[in-house]
Each structure stands twice: as structure tokens, then as C-alpha cells.
């Protein structure tokens, strides 16, 4: 038996204004070069823009967008007998949220527009409505998993 202690899983902290873990996860993914205050500014501006566009609670729009982009299943490359197969695997809720946030930010960065806050707010509103690049990415992932269903037994 090992003498090493067990490590407790870290829980995501909540942000200072909205007291929301999802907001904090999003800020940590926006973060570049350790400039966290800038990441907070970008997200809070985006939230303000969402409030102006939709005239509803921006946090509910954020939750709806992330829920709409979160994948249930993904494909993972696995080598079997010299050939690589795309094996569909189920994704847990935490990993799914992390993927959804990554896809939302990637889609927002690709968008044309003035600044990141504007692009992020547009992408979040689109994702909440069920359109946008991030939702397309999720559907594409699900299609890939469905197409490679025959390899599910390689898990």
C-alpha cells in the first residue's frame, strides 16, 4: 500500500460579481498571458451586451448556450492492428462543459467583429438560439460518433 496521500479534486471557484462557476470557467479559458483582469473585463462587457440584445437574464442565456453546445459523445482515435479507428466514447458532464466552453470561445475568436466582447456575446446568443459555429461543431462531433458506431466495442 502506498504511503502517498490522496488528492482531493479541485472544485471550480465562483467569480466575484455573479458568484457563478460557469462564469469563472469561461474567464479562465478567455485568459491569455496571465491577464485575468482583462479576461474579466471582456466577459463582463459581453454579458452587458447580451443583456442589451436579448433583454433577458444574461446568465440564463449563458447557461442555455453552454447546455446547447455540450456534447454527450465524442470520438477518440485508437490504434487497433495497425489501423487507427475513431472510437465513440461517452463524455462526462465536467469534460462536456469544458469542451463546450472551448468550442464557444474558438467560434467567437473566428467571428468577424470589433472586439472580443462583441464577438463572444454574438456567439453566446446564437448558441442559445441553437445556431452558430459552436453548435455546428457539436452536431458534427455527434455525426462522427454516429458514423463510427461500429467501432464502439473497441473502447
Curated annotation (Swiss-Prot):
Entries under PROSITE patterns matching the protein: RIBOSOMAL_S7
One annotated Gene Ontology cellular component of this protein: small ribosomal subunit
Cellular compartment(s): Plastid, Chloroplast
Gene Ontology molecular function: any one: structural constituent of ribosome
Biological process, per Gene Ontology: ribosomal small subunit assembly; translation
Segments crossing the lipid bilayer: none
Pfam families xref list: Ribosomal_S7 (PF00177)
Annotated keywords: Chloroplast, Plastid, Ribonucleoprotein, Ribosomal protein, RNA-binding, rRNA-binding
Described purpose of this protein according to its UniProt entry: Component of the chloroplast ribosome (chloro-ribosome), a dedicated translation machinery responsible for the synthesis of chloroplast genome-encoded proteins, including proteins of the transcription and translation machinery and components of the photosynthetic apparatus.
Family classification: Belongs to the universal ribosomal protein uS7 family.
Subunit annotation: Component of the chloroplast small ribosomal subunit (SSU). Mature 70S chloroplast ribosomes of higher plants consist of a small (30S) and a large (50S) subunit. The 30S small subunit contains 1 molecule of ribosomal RNA (16S rRNA) and 24 different proteins. The 50S large subunit contains 3 rRNA molecules (23S, 5S and 4.5S rRNA) and 33 different proteins.
Protein name: Small ribosomal subunit protein uS7cz/uS7cy
Source organism (scientific name): Spinacia oleracea
Lineage of origin: Eukaryota, Viridiplantae, Streptophyta, Embryophyta, Tracheophyta
Amino acid at each position: 500500500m502506498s504511503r502517498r496521500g490522496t488528492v482531493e479534486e479541485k472544485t471550480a471557484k465562483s467569480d466575484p460579481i455573479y458568484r457563478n462557476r460557469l462564469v469563472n470557467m469561461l474567464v479562465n479559458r478567455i485568459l491569455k498571458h496571465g491577464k485575468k483582469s482583462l479576461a474579466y473585463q471582456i466577459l463582463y462587457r459581453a454579458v452587458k451586451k447580451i443583456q442589451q440584445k436579448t433583454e433577458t437574464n444574461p446568465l440564463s442565456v449563458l447557461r442555455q448556450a453552454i447546455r446547447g453546445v455540450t456534447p454527450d459523445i465524442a470520438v477518440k482515435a485508437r490504434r487497433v492492428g495497425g489501423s487507427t479507428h475513431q472510437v465513440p466514447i461517452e463524455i462526462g458532464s465536467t469534460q462536456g462543459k469544458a469542451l463546450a466552453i472551448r468550442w464557444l470561445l474558438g467560434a467567437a475568436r473566428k467571428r468577424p467583429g470589433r472586439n472580443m466582447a462583441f464577438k463572444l456575446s454574438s456567439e453566446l446568443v446564437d448558441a442559445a438560439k441553437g445556431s452558430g459555429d459552436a453548435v455546428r461543431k457539436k452536431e458534427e462531433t455527434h455525426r462522427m460518433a454516429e458514423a463510427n458506431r461500429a467501432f464502439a466495442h473497441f473502447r
